[in-house]
Every structure is written in C-alpha cells, then in structure tokens.
C-alpha cells in the first residue's frame, strides 16, 4: 500500500499542501509527486527543510530569488512559494547564510 521514494536533497525544491485533503505535493528538479502525508511529518523526517508558510516547506539552497515586497520565493523550475509575513526575515537569513 505504501510506496517509498528517495531523492537527493539538493534536487528537492519545495513541498506544498495539496488541494486534496491529507496530501502533499513534492517538487524536485525532475518530478512533481503527490503523496499522502502532512508537512509536519515530512519536516520531522527532513529538518533541513524550512517552513516559510503554513502551506509550504522549502529547500533554501534551491531558492533562485526572494521577493520581499511580494513575499514570494522563486525556484529553478519556475515555481514559486508564498512566505508568511512573520517568516520573511527568517527565510532571508537562512538563504543568505547559505551563499
């Protein structure tokens, strides 16, 4: 019933909650994968991810651009994530500490 999959961490861009209940969508360098889980469960398994919004977990090392005014993060695949107002500074610092 349960499938297990692994991706190199550097290929993970971000995860978002799905419109379908109790599901999460994973965006990677090559794939888009939807599976049953919560962001909280994923975060417990992979603490290198950063929660930038209640609906998103990101891999800060793959952020291409941070737009503080619009509160958006952009990724190499053209995807974007929202940043909660109170998380902008934390996300900005995490990205700056990587580069």
Model features per residue range: what roles?
Residues 76-99:
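Long, non-transmembrane cytosolic or organellar matrix-exposed soluble domains/tails
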Residues 1-80:
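Conserved binding/recognition cores within well-folded domains
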